[in-house]
Amino acid sequence: MKYRKEKLERLARVAHLYYEEDKTQGEIAEILRVSRPLVSRMLNEARSIGIVEIRVRSLTSEPEPLSELLCQTYGLRSGIVVPDEESEDVTHYAMAQRLLAYIYEQQPAVVGIGWGTVIGLAAKRLEGIQVPSLAIQTICPLLGNSNVLSRQYHSDEHVRMFAEACGAQPVFLHAPVYTASEADANMFRETAQYQAVVDQWKKLDLAVAEIHDDSIIQRTGYCGQVNAVGYAAGYGMDAAGKMLSLPHTVMRIPLDMLKQCRRIIGICTADTSIQALQSVLRAGLITDVLAPESVAQQLVSKTQ
């Protein structure tokens, strides 16, 4: 079929908005003033004529020596290593797919979700689909929402998208990650909504948290800490892995409840520093790690 230049440009724009600007199909429909089903058809058409090319990798194969070394060195239950792609963005998409496979393998009943790049991509991949045969009953956030516009830093939004796809019950926090004062934080903690999330935190089977370095402070206005080199699930750690106390104004799962969780997977993106990953691993905060192969290689080389 021969396509007019205008149609090719329109298909390319839809593909760009969806795959590169992280827009949902609903958001694209609003931008272009068309129906959401039409956006879906246009994305399929863009793939069929070669505007979009997607490569599929095995979701269960990781470079075994690296995975084993990570587990042996840091006492992990699993070290999930994803081969690097041609760009960080494509690598992060592959990591998001592997994260979804990991969640499926665990079959948890209660899941806690943080925020970040890979978690946001995983939530997006679930948009508009139904995931079969999952044991998940409830999904809740691990920490409050960032005040930036980017959806990848809004844990309540991730909870909504995961819950819709899995047929699970969402429990929202409806609170910022960092409140203006201790009085504001206490006000949130007294609400019925906060107590409903606490009830789920006590029953967590799986916690999904991204690992961040100091760049998270610039991106989200997150409350940084002196001597902290790594952050995960609302907690900061120094280079030796010592947990640092955050102000009482930070809205996140209490540490004692987090440590009672059966599995805690820490996700290290391609642009997160090795020092941040090391600090979280040394703290013993996570039971599993998901990382790009290049990051895992650097980490192993520093510990040998």
Label each residue range with its predicted role.
Residues 106-110, 134-136, 204, 261, ...:
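A general structural motif
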Residues 2-5, 41-112, 123-135, 147-154:
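HTH-adjacent hinge/linker in prokaryotic transcriptional regulators
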Residues 118-132, 217-228:
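Short Gly/Thr/Asp-enriched flexible loops that form oxyanion-binding sites at enzyme active sites
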Residues 138-145:
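Catalytic or ion-translocation cores adjacent to nucleophile or general acid/base/metal-coordination motifs
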Residues 2-15, 20-33, 38-44, 50-57, ...:
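Conserved phosphate- and dinucleotide-binding cores of soluble alpha/beta proteins
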Residues 26, 94-111, 117-119, 202-219:
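N-terminal glycine-rich phosphate/adenylate-binding segment common to multiple enzyme folds
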Residues 83, 112-118, 269, 293:
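Glycine-rich beta-strand-to-loop/alpha-helix junction loops that act as flexible
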Residues 79-80, 140, 171:
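General small-molecule cofactor/ligand-binding pocket signal
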